């Protein structure tokens, strides 16, 4: 086990200060009779529902989106990678979904998996956590375990979540230190580690980090997740678990920024960055490949550096390296815009008035997730320059209003590529026939190396 807290040490401490509530919940988790509540039925929450249902726990899902709740009630799925058969199997195991938060009182453990976006000033927007905590508090009862999974800055669990929960009408307090009395509830942070579209690692094989507000909460959290994950990793405090999640994603953000910057240098030097990365990957130690692209997307990697930078200012610390990585990645859609303009210019065409087909709007290949997708930024930038933009994505027949954009665009058919002045590959979905696209298009600009192995005068990689 990595350096840090060992579960046997946590268990020893917790058992010496156990309460009737602690023992009761521990037993329920062991014999699978605990009622599990999952708040937020999106890309993180719904997979959690399925994992617990597979282990014969009775699960209740909570969401403010009635459309999602109704879809699940009918045995349907709104996430492409989760088939309806899995929803129906969960229902057979007792899963129900509701918008009624009063049913929180029925739960033994409540997992919070709600969004934590940034506001327009790149500052943390924790309004969903606040609203969820305020919805839980009136129905909180002694002995419940509340676990926050949403990605956030270190200190959120202790400084934000717990004080709101402790405003409950029963006067219950979060268990602290050795106080696990009968008027307490248990609190922990356990960061989600979902990787949409990654089929190489089973969800149950992803180790689960858990940091409780006290040792008893850590043990209960590990007991809870130990039922669905093959390994749990206890740490000494929620803030350690919160920082762990940020480190994981900032590591990726910084390395992606590095290869994005190297890509722009290699373009000027006439060197193929993809060939460079492939060659460097043959080194059996000290190197891990990261790949350039049109920008970064998803809920975590584009946002987490700004969460930590914001919190660091409270401690008079400037995280310049992290902030620079965020700036490099944020600038990549502008690099794509410039590359399209230059490619059109070489064909004696202007970007203003050009017909551009954007292939792929999901933030990465083979998923139905638009969150923070660089494609949305690129479409808006092209439109502002006067381009006539269309798009195709096998997972999105329509792109409407989102957190930052209101594009209101319908997917066009995947045909007649020659009618467009430029076909821009933003997301390299496996469904696309790239050889055909290059063959039938006037100009193709590839931001993902999707056309590797293809050579043509109308093909530009950027």
Regions found by a protein language model. Name each.
Residues 2-462:
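Structural/interface elements that position substrates and couple domains in central-metabolism enzymes
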């Amino acid at each position: 086990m990595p350096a840090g807290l060992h579960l046997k040490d946590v268990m020893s401490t917790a058992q010496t200060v156990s309460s009737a509530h602690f023992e009761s919940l521990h037993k329920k988790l062991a014999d699978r009779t605990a009622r599990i509540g999952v708040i937020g039925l999106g890309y993180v929450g719904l997979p959690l529902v399925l994992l617990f249902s597979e282990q014969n726990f009775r699960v209740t899902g909570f969401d403010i989106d009635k459309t999602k709740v109704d879809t699940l009630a009918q045995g349907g799925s709104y996430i492409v990678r989760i088939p309806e058969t899995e929803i129906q199997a969960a229902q057979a195991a007792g899963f129900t979904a509701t918008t009624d938060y009063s049913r929180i009182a029925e739960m033994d453990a409540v997992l919070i998996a709600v969004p934590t976006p940034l506001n327009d000033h790149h500052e943390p927007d924790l309004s969903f956590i606040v609203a969820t905590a305020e919805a839980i508090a009136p129905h909180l009862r002694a002995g419940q375990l509340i676990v926050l999974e949403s990605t956030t800055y270190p200190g959120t669990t202790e400084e934000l979540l717990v004080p709101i929960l402790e405003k409950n009408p029963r006067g219950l307090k979060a268990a602290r230190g050795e106080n696990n009395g009968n008027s307490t509830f248990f609190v922990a942070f356990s960061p989600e580690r979902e990787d949409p579209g990654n089929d190489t690692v089973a969800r149950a094989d992803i180790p689960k980090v858990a940091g409780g507000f006290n040792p008893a909460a850590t043990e209960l959290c590990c007991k809870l997740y130990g039922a669905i994950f093959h390994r749990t990793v206890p740490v000494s405090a929620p803030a350690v678990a919160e920082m762990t999640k940020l480190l994981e994603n900032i590591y990726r953000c910084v390395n992606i920024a590095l290869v994005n910057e190297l890509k722009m240098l290699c373009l000027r030097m006439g060197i193929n960055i993809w060939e460079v990365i492939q060659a460097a990957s043959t080194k059996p130690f000290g190197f891990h490949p990261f790949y350039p692209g049109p920008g970064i997307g998803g809920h975590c990697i584009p946002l987490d550096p700004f969460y930590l930078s914001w919190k660091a200012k409270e401690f008079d610390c400037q995280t310049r390296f992290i902030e620079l990585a965020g700036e490099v990645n944020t600038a990549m859609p502008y690099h794509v815009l410039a590359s399209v303009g230059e490619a059109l210019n070489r064909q004696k065409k202007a970007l203003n008035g050009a017909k551009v087909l954007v292939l792929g709007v999901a933030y990465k290949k083979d998923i139905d997730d638009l969150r923070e997708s660089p494609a949305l930024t690129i479409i808006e930038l092209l439109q502002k320059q006067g381009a006539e933009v269309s798009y195709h994505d096998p997972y999105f027949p329509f792109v409407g209003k989102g957190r930052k954009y209101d594009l209101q665009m319908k997917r066009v058919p995947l045909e007649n590529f020659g009618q467009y002045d430029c076909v821009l590959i933003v997301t390299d979905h496996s469904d696309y026939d790239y050889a055909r696209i290059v063959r039938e298009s006037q100009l193709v600009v590839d931001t993902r190396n999707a056309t590797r192995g293809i050579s043509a005068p109308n093909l530009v990689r950027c």
